[in-house]
Amino acid sequence: MAVLKLCEQPPLVQAIFSGDPEEIRMLIHKTEDVNALDSEKRTPLHVAAFLGDAEIIELLILSGARVNAKDNMWLTPLHRAVASRSEEAVQVLIKHSADVNARDKNWQTPLHVAAANKAVKCAEVIIPLLSSVNVSDRGGRTALHHAALNGHMEMVNLLLAKGANINAFDKKDRRALHWAAYMGHLDVVALLINHGAEVTCKDKKGYTPLHAAASNGQISVVKHLLNLGVEIDEINVYGNTALHIACYNGQDAVVNELIDYGANVNQPNNSGFTPLHFAAASTHGALCLELLVNNGADVNIQSKDGKSPLHMTAVHGRFTRSQTLIQNGGEIDCVDKDGNTPLHVAARHGHELLINTLITSGADTAKCGIHSMFPLHLAALNAHSDCCRKLLSSGFEIDTPDTFGRTCLHAAAAGGNVECIKLLQSSGADFHKKDKCGRTPLHYAAANCHFHCIKALVTTGANVNETDDWGRTALHYAAASDMDRNKMILGNAHDNSEELERAREVKEKDAALCLEFLLQNDANPSIRDKEGYNSIHYAAAYGHRQCLELLLERTNTGFEESDGGALKSPLHLAAYNGHHQALEVLLQSLVDLDIRDEKGRTALYLAAFKGHTECVEALVNQGASIFVKDNVTKRTPLHASVINGHTLCLRLLLETADNPEVVDVKDAKGQTPLMLAVAYGHIDAVSLLLEKEANVDAVDIVGCTALHRGIMTGHEECVQMLLEQEASILCKDSRGRTPLHYAAARGHATWLNELLQIALSEEDCCLKDNQGYTPLHWACYNGNENCIEVLLEQKCFRKFIGNPFTPLHCAIINGHESCASLLLGAIDPSIVSCRDDKGRTTLHAAAFGDHAECLQLLLRHDAQVNAVDNSGKTALMMAAENGQAGAVDILVNSAQADLTVKDKDLNTPLHLAISKGHEKCALLILDKIQDESLINAKNSALQTPLHIAARNGLKVVVEELLAKGACVLAVDENASRSNGPRSPPGTAVRKEE
């Protein structure tokens, strides 16, 4: 909120501050605007209310001032009057209809403001006009919260008397008692508790009033709560007690009081930290730690991650507290879950005084910690030279490796402090030592661009061409120094893009400096690693322009070819990673810009695929070909740019093409860039290709056009653009399907309608695919009701044409009852009797799929329940043979299907159910059979149902057949009886004479 100079304000505002009603009247009479706004949208009435001048307020309102005007914080004059505790001003404003429920931007009403500012008289005027005193602001706080927070005893009394909810909570579930306790308003705390406030209440994170008071050092409130008998060791959601909180905030007086009242000094929280851990770490916890130790706190207790209080002092460098812990029995070499002692932790964080204390007290400097590293490893890795000096003086085998074979010198080289390097070298560290990957300290220094470390190592004799297990030298690592990783690390601390870019430039220069020094000391830039890459490849891959320039000056290595086992050239690597500056350096030294990688892709292809516009521009400007196809998919850079929707790259490629036909170039599958753009839904790319007159009716190897693909993938805007270019909608693919078929199959009713209008206006409109299926077949098969409705609006679809497996069959076979109902309602109901080329009716289809609702629909439309197909089977037989018990139940019990019908092999429904082992279906049929002749009916193999049931081991069916009079002596064509012994496999049973 700005502070304005009174002398610069309008005369009316100055007169209000002067308190001169006569001058105000004169100014108003001179048409001074009574509703004029200042820079913060405050009116003269806001000023008068702020001053609490009732007479002037009255005068302004009678002169037309808006009583409920809001400033830019949404504060009304009533808010201002209440804040000034002016009862008279409040009464005048309310008399003139001031809104007592008005809210500011924090949703605070005048009552909130009154409560916060101890405006008791104002509150007494406002409250009778309110429906509730428990209205909450944006933070969920009521007027009682504000009164308690500010310690206004009289206001709290008034609000409680007027019905304020004493246990109302804000959005963090904090009560008025929490706020009063935190602020140390003992009289308010006592008053709230006396009126029934819940003394053990918790907020969302489990903090009680005791936690709140302890955190802010409110000793009197803490004593009062303890005297009331609250649970002293109550925990919050993190497992912290009031003692934890007091120690964390360095409230030693509260700590002393809690200990005197019996608080558990060794209570662990959810992470296993005790109050002593917090006291050891906190900024102001020294006295707290003394109190805890003197009252029996366990100095060696460990958290869940193994940290002792001594570890905590080591993290934060609290060396005085570390001495206290050690003097009271703290274990110096206690290890955490990573194996680190306090000395490791202190070394990592660079606390020299603490290291001195620990070593003096007997800490083991040669103890192995995380990854078997010494404290010296960690000090060197984090570039703490003074700590290294302290640790070196204790004496141990300096070249002892960690788990990964790294010595302290490796760590120092990675850390980048040359003083650490010199200290270790002067102590006899061997710079020839290799880690388990074969890397020397020089490799580490180069990888991190630590120039002075590289210089120190090379000067003392380090081999600049020493290779690691992957065949990489220090030059490889310097060339590959990851700027983006450094940028990311810097970004954790800074969020300024300019600053990050400057930092990147500094690192780039460091890398170039390191590289130049290595080259000056006979580093060989031609050495290739085991993947065939040399330092030029790495510099290109990581975009180090300066490094590339240096390397290209120093080497005659032919890097145009992907030789030496390398899969990609430097040009490919720079293009793929979008390093246009590095690319430009390479282009100056290259003759062939169209060299290929192992898959036949050029650098231009990779740049276009990744969408690196500047790289694409650099390549095409230098003459890179856009016609070169890869070896696998036969795609060009045009295809590559389209796949990921890189329209800028696509435009560059098209505008530099000499041959306009390039826009329709095809890949191995016959796909043009337009087809791919449509398939992937890249609208801008589609628009650009159409602008460049791409052929909308080009077909791929399966006959699909871009329109086919657009409808298949459902990209609406792409389809619309193709239709606007009059793309053929009757073009058939290799299966004879048009875009209409795909629209119907995919459920695109809107497109289908639009396509139909165009298709039906053309002559020779054939809408059958190679199998005779129409769009109606496909819509029905996939259950697309909206599409069916669109198609049935056209007269030509109200009769079934094409494949005799009709649209009704298609709907029924997949259980689309609503689609079938649409067809039956729009077309002659006699279509239920339509047969496919195998003579099967729609009822057969419903029975086959066990679709009960479809069966019932067809039966309601007089479907012939006993109609047989070409093999003599009824719908019941179809259901029985396929084990569709639901369909069998409906056909047998509701439709009363004929159980005596036989197929061409003389099988009854019962034979078929039993032959396939469908016990439930067989029992449903048996339940309706009373005729023994049907029970003993024989098929063409002279088998009765009993023969088949016995052979298939259907025990329950056999029992039911026998109960219904099945003949056990019946003989089939192999002379087998249903109850006789089975013949051995491969032998014939001799016929009885």
From Swiss-Prot:
ANK repeats: 7-36, 40-69, 73-102, 106-135, 139-168, 172-201, 205-234, 238-267, 271-301, 305-334, 338-367, 371-400, 404-433, 437-466, 470-498, 531-561, 566-595, 599-628, 633-662, 669-698, 702-731, 735-764, 771-800, 803-832, 838-867, 871-901, 905-934, 941-970
Alphabetized Pfam families for the sequence: Ank (PF00023), Ank_2 (PF12796), Ank_4 (PF13637)
RNA-binding in keyword set: no
Region spans: Disordered: 974-993
Keyword annotations from UniProtKB, A to Z: ANK repeat, Repeat
InterPro entries membership: Ankyrin_rpt, Ankyrin_rpt-contain_sf
Role according to the record: Putative regulatory subunit of protein phosphatase 6 (PP6) that may be involved in the recognition of phosphoprotein substrates.
Subunit annotation: Protein phosphatase 6 (PP6) holoenzyme is proposed to be a heterotrimeric complex formed by the catalytic subunit, a SAPS domain-containing subunit (PP6R) and an ankyrin repeat-domain containing regulatory subunit (ARS). Interacts with PPP6R1.
Protein name: Serine/threonine-protein phosphatase 6 regulatory ankyrin repeat subunit B
Taxon lineage: Eukaryota, Metazoa, Chordata, Craniata, Vertebrata
Gene: Ankrd44
